[in-house]
A protein has these predicted regions:
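N-terminal, positively charged regions that mediate nucleic acid binding
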Residues: 1-35
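Residues forming anionic-ligand binding surfaces in small-molecule and nucleic-acid pockets
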Residues: 3-4, 115-133
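Flexible, glycine/charged-enriched surface loops at secondary-structure junctions
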Residues: 32-40, 83-93, 152-169, 200
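Glycine-rich, N-terminal phosphate-binding loop and its surrounding beta-alpha-beta segment
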Residues: 37-40, 48-109
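Short, conserved charged micro-motifs
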Residues: 61-69, 135, 186-193
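Internal alpha/beta scaffold segment
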Residues: 138-157, 196
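Loop-centered beta-sheet repeat module
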Residues: 161-164, 172-197
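Conserved small/polar residues in nucleotide/adenosyl-binding loops
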Residues: 198-204
Length: 208
């Protein structure tokens, strides 16, 4: 049986979207600890510098307006996107705030003087294992460790951008790794392979 796990860097669009949503939640709770937030973020690169749409439902008491959303989005992007990333430019980026008040049906169903409902929110559970020092499953542990090392390289190499993905497959005769990262147009594929082999997979004795 083959097992595959993948992790994405903080510069991957999925992670950036999660970060923006997390910032919205943090801001809402700081404004009022009883705020209810169900927020989703969509972003895409464009020829005019990028588009970010923040939507979902949020309590009125959270008090986050268009200017607040704009600041949240730009703060998050400033931490996760390099200036060389052509599809996103903070000075020309379009930001849409599509947050709406929480529906009365949901509010009345989850708010009670004695019982506090969770709405449609859930908690994902996993398991711990003594196979690794992190107590995470080996496939995920390897993928995450390589991604963390790659993130350090990306932040110090001007030829690399911050969007990347690492996929690790175990269960066969050998562990296999696929590393994908955005980069400048002029970088050579052999140079990328050398970086991957020397700094990422060689120390862990994995095949590329």
């Amino acid at each position: 049986m083959y097992k595959t796990a993948e992790t994405v860097s903080p510069g991957h669009p999925d992670k950036i979207a999660d970060l923006i949503s997390d910032y919205v939640l943090t801001e809402a709770l700081s404004n009022n600890s009883k705020s209810r937030v169900a927020v989703e973020t969509f972003l895409t690169g464009t020829t005019y510098g990028g588009l970010v749409v923040v939507g979902g439902e949020i309590s009125d008491i959270a008090k986050i307006d268009d200017k607040g959303i704009e600041k949240i989005v730009k703060d998050a992007l400033a931490k996760t996107i390099k200036t060389s990333f052509e599809d996103f430019q903070l000075d020309s980026l379009k930001i849409q705030n599509e947050l709406t008040p929480q529906s009365e049906e949901i509010r009345s169903a989850v708010e009670d003087d004695e019982d506090l409902g969770a709405g449609d929110q859930g908690i994902m559970v996993g398991y711990a294992t003594n196979e690794t020092q992190s107590f995470m499953p080996p496939t995920f542990d390897i993928s995450r460790n390589i991604q963390m090392a790659l993130w350090e390289i990306q932040n110090n190499d001007e030829k690399l951008d911050l969007d990347s993905k690492v996929q690790v497959t175990t269960g066969g005769e050998e562990t296999k790794v696929v590393i994908s990262t955005q980069h400048k147009k002029d970088i050579d594929i052999d140079e990328l392979r050398t970086v991957s082999y020397t700094h990422l997979t060689l120390p862990t004795k994995l095949s590329v």
